[in-house]
Design a protein with these regions (language model features):
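Active-site pocket-lining/capping segments in soluble small-molecule metabolic enzymes
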Residues: 1-4, 76, 84-86, 90-100, ...
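Short, hinge-like loop/turn segments at secondary-structure boundaries
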Residues: 41-42, 91-92, 110-113, 138-140, ...
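Glycine-rich phosphate-binding active-site loops on the catalytic face of alpha/beta enzymes
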Residues: 59-62, 70-85, 124-129, 156-189
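Short, electropositive alpha-helical surface patch
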Residues: 31-53, 140, 150-151, 171-178
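Conserved N-terminal beta1-alpha1 strand-loop-helix module at the mouth
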Residues: 1-49, 66, 95-134, 158
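Hydrophobic faces of well-ordered beta-strands that scaffold small-molecule active sites
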Residues: 23-25, 53-57, 73-75, 93-97, ...
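Glycine-enriched alpha-helix->loop->beta-strand junction motifs that scaffold or abut catalytic
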Residues: 19, 48-50, 66-74, 88-94, ...
Length: 199
C-alpha cells in the first residue's frame, strides 16, 4: 500500500484512497521512550485540517504550535496510575481501554465512568498486529455502556465480516490498520465511503 515511510505521504495516500474522517496515530517514541515527535505531529495537524487525528503519546503532553481543532489526545489505561479527565474538556479526549484478559492499569471502571469522555477505544493488545481475529467477547462484555459512550474496537479486525459483526454488536467504529495494510477493503465499500459527504 505504501512506497514510503514518510507519515505525511502515507496519510496523503490513505486520504486519497479511503477518504477517512478520523485517523489514529500511536507515537511509539513517545509511548516507549517519552520522546514526543512534536514537529511531525504539528506538521500533520497543519497539513490535514479536514481530518480528525486521535493521537496517543503515552500520556506525554504534545507541545502544539496552536490550538488544533482536529487534535484529540488519547489516554490509555495501560500507562495510567489512576487518572481522571477534566469534565470541561471531555469532548476533545479519547480514552483507550488497553486489554489483555482484563483492563490494564490502575483502573477501577465503575469509579472512572463519570470522568470518561464519550469516545472509548477497546484495544485488545493480544490481537493488535497478530494473526488472531477480533475479540468480540470483550466487546459483548462492555457493550452495556454503548448507550452512554461511543465504543470503538481495536485489534484483530481482518475482514469486512469482522467490520459487519462489530457494527451488529453495537460498536460505533473500528481501527482497521490490518485491513489497510493488506488492502482487503472491497472496492464497493471504498466507493461508498468516497461518495459520502465530508462532515
Amino acid at each position: 500500500l505504501y512506497s514510503t515511510t514518510d507519515p505525511k505521504q502515507i496519510i496523503s495516500t490513505i486520504k486519497k484512497r479511503y477518504k477517512p474522517s478520523i485517523i489514529y496515530i500511536a507515537d511509539l517514541d513517545a509511548i516507549i521512550d517519552n520522546k514526543v515527535n512534536t514537529k511531525i505531529i504539528n506538521d500533520i495537524l497543519i497539513d490535514f485540517p479536514e481530518i480528525n487525528f486521535w493521537i496517543d503519546t503515552g500520556l506525554n503532553i504534545l507541545k502544539s504550535k496552536k490550538r488544533f481543532m482536529n487534535y484529540h489526545s488519547v489516554f490509555c489505561t495501560e500507562n495510567s496510575i489512576g487518572f481522571d479527565i477534566d469534565s470541561n474538556n471531555k469532548k476533545k479526549y479519547v480514552c483507550s481501554f488497553d486489554y489483555k484478559k482484563r483492563i490494564l492499569g490502575n483502573v477501577n471502571l465503575p469509579r472512572l465512568l463519570k470522568y470518561l469522555p464519550k469516545k472509548i477505544i477497546l484495544m485488545d493488545l493480544e490481537q493488535v498486529g497478530s494473526s488472531k481475529h477480533a475479540n468480540f467477547k470483550m466487546l459483548r462484555k462492555y457493550i452495556k455502556y454503548s448507550t452512554k459512550y461511543e465504543l470503538y474496537i481495536a485489534g484483530g479486525i481482518k475482514t469486512t465480516l469482522d467490520l459487519n459483526r462489530a457494527k451488529s454488536l453495537g460498536a460505533r467504529g473500528v481501527l482497521v490498520s490490518s485491513i489497510l495494510k493488506k488492502d482487503c477493503l472491497p472496492r464497493l465499500l471504498i466507493q461508498k465511503r468516497k461518495n459520502q459527504p465530508t462532515n
